[in-house]
Structures are given as structure tokens and as C-alpha cells.
């Protein structure tokens, strides 16, 4: 089991479905740069935006993803950053389990979202289009 899988298992059943934030940060940080992007990348960026900027819980992010999945469309291109943050699942796992590790997950999300900040207006437009938030 690699560090991502271990962190994934750790978050299963944690309060507010923080597993969703782990999935979103990991997808955005590790996806191959390609345009048009895979739907998972768009959903990950939307999830990070909603969590970091709007304070959405993992459950609320998952519900937003459900709304977006109902309408098929082509997705806008992503501006791919050269660096996507220094934190990784291994960094997060180095923090003792519990509230401190959960806060480290939030810090990881913030770092990855910051790396993708050139996509903020595109993501905000999608949020408006789907009337989320």
C-alpha cells in the first residue's frame, strides 16, 4: 500500500467526509497535464476551490460533483502549473492521526489549490454555471 492509499484508508469514516479532499488534492497534484483535461481533474479543481475558498465539507463537495455530473459537456482547458506543491500524502501521514492530520489535509489542499490558482476564474465560472454554492 502506498502513502496515498494509506491516507485514503485513514480518512474513510472521518468526520465531514474529508476523504473527498484527499482524492481531489491527489488527482490535481498527480494528473498528467493534458487538454482537454479529464473530467476528474475538473472535478478535483472544483472540489479544491469549494473547500479552500468556500469552506465546503467533503460531503458538500461530493454533492457539487453530483450536480456537475448530470450535465454532459466539454470541459475548459486547464492551466497546468509547473510545480503543484511540496506537500504529499507522505507529508500528511507524517503528522499524528487525529485533528492535526486532518488539518494537514487542509493545508495540502490549500497548497495544491494555490499551485492551480491560474484556473480560479475558470472554476468560479463553472460554479456559477452549475449554480453551486
Regions found by a protein language model. Give the residues of each.
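Intrinsically disordered, low-complexity linkers and terminal regions
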Residues: 2-133
Amino acid at each position: 500500500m502506498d502513502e496515498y492509499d494509506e491516507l485514503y484508508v485513514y480518512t474513510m469514516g472521518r468526520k465531514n467526509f474529508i476523504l473527498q479532499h484527499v482524492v481531489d488534492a491527489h488527482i490535481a497534484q498527480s494528473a498528467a497535464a493534458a487538454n482537454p483535461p479529464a473530467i476528474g481533474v475538473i472535478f478535483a479543481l472544483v472540489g479544491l476551490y469549494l473547500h479552500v475558498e468556500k469552506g465546503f465539507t467533503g460531503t458538500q463537495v461530493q454533492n457539487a460533483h453530483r450536480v456537475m455530473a448530470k450535465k454532459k459537456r466539454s470541459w475548459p482547458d486547464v492551466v497546468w502549473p509547473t510545480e503543484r506543491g511540496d506537500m504529499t500524502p507522505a507529508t500528511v501521514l507524517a503528522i499524528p492521526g487525529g485533528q492535526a492530520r486532518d488539518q494537514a489535509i487542509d493545508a495540502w489542499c490549500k497548497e495544491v489549490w494555490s499551485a492551480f490558482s491560474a484556473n480560479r476564474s475558470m472554476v468560479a465560472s463553472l460554479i456559477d454555471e452549475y449554480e453551486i454554492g
